[in-house]
Amino acid sequence: GIIEDLIQFGMEKLVLFGTCGVLDQDIEATSIIIPTSALRDEGTSYHYLPASDEVEVNKGIIPLFQSFLDSHKVSYQKGKVWTTDAPYRETIGKMKRRKESGAICVDMECSAVAALAAFRGFELCHFFYAADHLSEEKWDIRTLSSHSDLDSKDRIADLAIQFALFWEKAD
């Protein structure tokens, strides 16, 4: 709802970042992940786009964002995200299937926001920082819901603001 309101107020570009759970233990906490596509395992995106298994994310913005991160000497990974609105149904079986489909992380809104961006025609730069780790054995909360590694989290928020300013000037 908030993004729809922002569109009505004239928003044309959106930089959105937040946490994600990683499906690969080698992805360190607070690592930046740039989603390239999202597996649609939620309901909202289907109100904006026809049914499909995936939706493209960050259409057209990835090269500019990568260049920005490179110029700031910030490492990142690109990959597919699994979006679900049912976190307590992130079962071992589903997680294995999503990993087999290429997902490296899981979040709760990426596919819905990407569908909204495609439908409403605004530009989107969506990225994550790794928080918890999901595996077949157990859930590792890492830095999710804690005050640990606040300096890295502050740096990521600052990067989002700096990229928004950079992106505005790039046009």
Task: Give the location of each predicted region.
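Generic structural signal for well-ordered, non-membrane alpha-helical segments
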Residues: 54, 58-62, 91, 106, ...
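Short acidic/polar active-site loop segments enriched in Thr and Asp
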Residues: 12-13, 104, 123
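Generic non-transmembrane alpha-helical segments
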Residues: 64-72, 116, 159-170
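Zn-dependent metallopeptidase/amidohydrolase metal-coordination segment
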Residues: 111-148
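Active-site rim beta-loop-alpha module in soluble metabolic enzymes
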Residues: 52-100
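His/Asp/Glu-rich mid-to-C-terminal helical/loop segments that flank catalytic regions of hydrolases
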Residues: 134-171
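Metabolite-binding pocket within alpha/beta catalytic cores that recognizes anionic/polar moieties
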Residues: 1-55, 59-63, 119
